[in-house]
Swiss-Prot record:
This is NAD-dependent malic enzyme, mitochondrial. The gene is MAE102. Keywords: Cytoplasm, Metal-binding, Mitochondrion, NAD, Nucleus, Oxidoreductase, Transit peptide. Belongs to the malic enzymes family. It comes from the Eukaryota. GO terms for molecular function: malate dehydrogenase (decarboxylating) (NAD+) activity; metal ion binding; NAD binding. The keyword Protein biosynthesis does not apply. The lineage of its organism: Eukaryota, Fungi, Dikarya, Basidiomycota, Agaricomycotina. One of its GO terms (cellular component) is nucleus. Its cofactor is Mg(2+); Mn(2+).
């Protein structure tokens, strides 16, 4: 196959790269070069070509930007100089342009272009318009962007490694690390196998890694030059995507878990050696792999899984607030809450395990806490007498919550489980739109003065229950939190604000806190501490309004508080190395986290 090569030139006066199409059909780079724009420096190696490169360039603008007043040197031109445009003018222009774009996806694409060309401008608009733009740069819009990643692709955004590179990963990352001026602080890594609730999107998962890091910077204050998005291309089982002529990933079926584990072993070892101070966040691996990798690497590397641990943390925080309100309304003890889950994937099991800490805080043993949960998957309530459990065919991660007390009776539907359990809380992680039926929701309202209902599946197109329906079917008594954002609703003359159990409220604080503490690893206690810190971050006004989570516009302050809680727990667990933070109380630690945040 004939390849069209390119060469790069860097002008020191304006740090602009121009792609020049070569007339030759042979790509020749005699030496490795470095570019540095956007999140992180990316080396150009001889392995780069237009077809399936091992390492691609990140944040490479396709045209020279207009000179601004902040430029260190004027551009040397023979013609009249360009007008000097202030950063404030650029920011106003970008905001106006975004307002004129008709769809969220077009806004997402334009913002991605701005981030590659001018990171300061991108994060300035994110700072000013975070509440409006978070759903654009991340869920729900990022789901569509990942589905259409190859169609809207306009340039490389991070580190792309495929299964064919398995034996070369240590060499690749050693060479890569040796050329970096700014080493990575945060790596967000996915294999694209379970993107949100949308399934296997292959190399399109890069959009999730980039989106998460956008939020790390905007919400957590991580320096964008220390962020590295990574996609591990192991093929895809999505035939529609794989057969698309525009698809830029490996056009083969996804490898099995054994081969994927060998690839992950190589990557985790090489990444931790090349970037010894970085935090590695696993994102959107399919359930079996997610649990296997978390168990395999948690005690060995500085890593966590956001789908399992981050989701568990944020839902535990919301449940802490909701359970207190519900118990105040009913007069029932906190330890008597009963929770039904619709969904048996990695996120559901991870959330349920984290929520067990709530009941253990009330004095229950671990076994007693586990008995407060009932999990429903596609076959119904998970019981010891169900056929797939008896035959041993049930996924291993579900075994922890098998019920042994149903006396041989099976409960195939959500409605039948609600009648059997009579729960106080209903949590959805099924990725099935509308799965919380009107009958189920109304029955929850009959059973509880303040029913706790958390439809958490992302994006909105996969959410189990809309906020408006939740209000109507419970006569406004619902304690509601969703995974994707819903707008406030007028109900009987009162403006009601929905809770959003968005991982955005915790994962920046977990990662940032682990970085600031210099953690050797990220403990289970640190994850639980992040949930407690989030629940304590509510202001008196937010509590008075019955909110379950802090408002998103306060995310920087919230992230600092979460990070402080993570640092404190790291010190108690003996995994911190930053001695300068030891001995500080939580208020002083929060102030230190605020000072350490990066701002555009």
């Amino acid at each position: 196959m004939t390849r069209t090569p390119f060469t790069l030139s860097l002008r020191s006066t304006d740090s602009v790269f121009k792609i020049r199409q070569s007339l030759s059909t042979v790509l020749s780079h005699s030496s490795t070069k470095i570019i540095s724009r956007g999140y992180i420096t990316i080396p150009i190696t001889s392995t780069i070509a237009y077809h399936r490169p091992t390492i691609r360039l990140f944040n490479m603008p396709i045209a020279a930007p207009v000179r601004t007043l902040s430029s260190s040197q004027p551009l040397k031109r023979s013609t009249s100089p360009l007008p000097a445009i202030t950063p404030a003018q650029n920011l106003l222009r970008l905001k106006a342009h975004l307002q004129n774009l008709p769809t969220p996806l077009l806004k997402h694409v334009h913002l991605s272009k701005i981030r590659r060309e001018d990171p300061n401008l991108f994060f300035s608009v994110m700072r000013d318009e975070l509440t409006d733009l978070a759903p654009i740069v991340y869920t729900p819009t990022v789901g569509e962007a990942c589905q259409k990643y190859s169609q809207i692709y306009s340039g490389p955004e991070g580190l792309y490694l495929n299964i064919e590179d398995k034996d070369r990963i240590p060499e690749i990352l050693r060479q890569y690390a040796s050329k970096l001026v700014t080493p990575p602080q945060i790596l967000v890594v996915t294999d694209g196998s379970r993107i949100l609730g949308l399934g296997d999107l292959g190399i399109g998962g890069m959009g999730i890694s980039v989106g998460k890091l956008n939020l790390y910077v905007a919400g957590g204050g991580v320096n964008p030059h220390g962020c590295l998005p990574v996609v591990l291309d192991m093929g895809t089982n999505n035939e529609t995507i794989r057969n698309d002529p525009l698809y830029i990933g490996l056009k083969q079926s996804r490898v099995g878990l054994e081969e994927a584990t060998e690839f992950m072993d190589a990557f985790m070892a090489a990444a931790s050696e090349a970037f010894p101070k970085a935090v590695i966040q696993h994102e959107d691996f399919y359930s079996e792999a997610a649990f296997d990798f978390l168990a395999r690497y948690k005690e060995k590397y500085r890593m966590f899984n956001d789908d399992i641990e981050g989701t568990g943390s944020v839902i535990l925080a919301g449940f802490l607030a909701a359970a207190k309100q519900a118990s105040e309304a009913s007069g029932k003890p906190l330890r008597d809450h009963k929770v039904v889950f619709l969904g048996g994937g990695s996120a559901a099991v991870g959330v349920a395990k984290e929520m067990m800490n709530f009941f253990m805080m009330q004095g229950l043993t671990e076994d007693e806490a586990r008995e407060r949960f009932w999990l429903i998957d596609t076959k119904g309530l998970i019981t010891s007498t169900r056929a797939d459990v008896v035959s041993g065919k049930i996924a291993s991660h579900k075994k922890f919550f098998i019920r042994n007390d149903t006396e041989g009776k099976e409960y195939p539907s959500l409605e039948s489980v609600i009648e059997y359990v009579q729960p106080t809380a209903l949590v959805g992680l099924s990725t099935t739109f509308g799965a919380f039926s009107e009958f189920a929701v109304r029955r929850m309202a009959e059973l509880n003065q303040s029913p706790i209902i958390f439809p958490l599946s992302n994006p909105t197109s996969k959410c189990e229950l809309a906020f408006s329906d939740a209000l109507e079917w419970t006569d406004g008594r619902v304690l509601f939190a969703s995974g994707s954002p819903y707008p406030p609703q007028q109900f009987k003359g009162t403006l009601r604000e929905p809770g959003q159990g968005n991982n955005f409220l915790v994962f920046p604080g977990i990662g940032f806190g682990a970085l600031q503490a210099g953690c050797k690893r990220i403990t289970t206690g640190m994850i639980t501490a992040s949930a407690i810190a989030l629940s304590e971050a509510l202001t008196p006004e937010e509590k008075q309004k019955g909110l379950l989570y802090p408002r998103l516009e306060r995310i920087r302050a919230v992230s600092a508080r979460v990070a402080a809680g993570v640092v404190k727990q790291a010190q108690e667990d003996g995994v911190d190395t930053n001695e300068t933070l030891r001995g500080l109380d939580i208020e002083a630690l929060t102030e230190e986290m605020n000072k350490a945040q990066w701002w555009p």
